[in-house]
Amino acid sequence: MAWVMHEHADVDTLAASVATELQAFCGEAIALRGQALLALGGGRTPLPLYRRLARCPLPWSQVTLLPTDERCVPHDDPACNLREIGAAFAAADGVELQGLTPPNGDPETSERHARAALAQYPQPFDAVVLGMGMDGHTASLFPGVPRLPEALDPASDIDACRIDPQPLPPEAPYPRVTLTAARLLRARSLHLYLSGADKRAVLERALRSHDPLRYPIGAFLHAADARLHVHWSP
């Protein structure tokens, strides 16, 4: 089995439990290597987790956070994942944030910028936190986009690529840059963070499908060489 399910009583328990796990992973990484590296999904669902983790006692100046994906918007735009993550970690004094796009969010240079940024961090992530949309996408790995097979290839040596959702989501109509599945799977711990019955139903369909082009989260649920910890609450 490439995945393991952790069910939590409610969203507060979910956030507290996963924050405790991530704190432990960070502490272990810092003790062993002097640095912890995390890739974090955007959106509203994980923000309580991030705020709780930010209050944990860690040497935050030795922790680096990257988004798993980013919208090609300026860094001060409310739609910017880096901006939201930074706000959620306001209590984590000294934490380092690494963006995937240039400050102006230029779509034409964002892929190159992301690959150069990731080249500074060749080591595996100490933890990755993924979310999942109602269409089964994770990060910005959307079903049906032309570059999806390339972005999901587990043998790829490409760390990031530009994704243009088709059609663009009306709530966030922007080109994206996303970490590839191969880069996200290069992690010491891999977590999917979900809540609600609707998301549980999508998860069950993805588990049955075994087709990551239809449900991109399946590339992580069924990965041969990684174990995905699925954290869910009602």
Whereabouts are the PLM-identified features?
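Class I SAM-dependent methyltransferase SAM-binding "motif I" and its flanking Rossmann-like core
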Residues: 134-182
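N-terminal glycine-/serine-/threonine-rich phosphate-binding loop
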Residues: 1-38
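Glycine-rich beta-strand-to-loop/alpha-helix junction loops that act as flexible
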Residues: 40-45, 130-134, 195
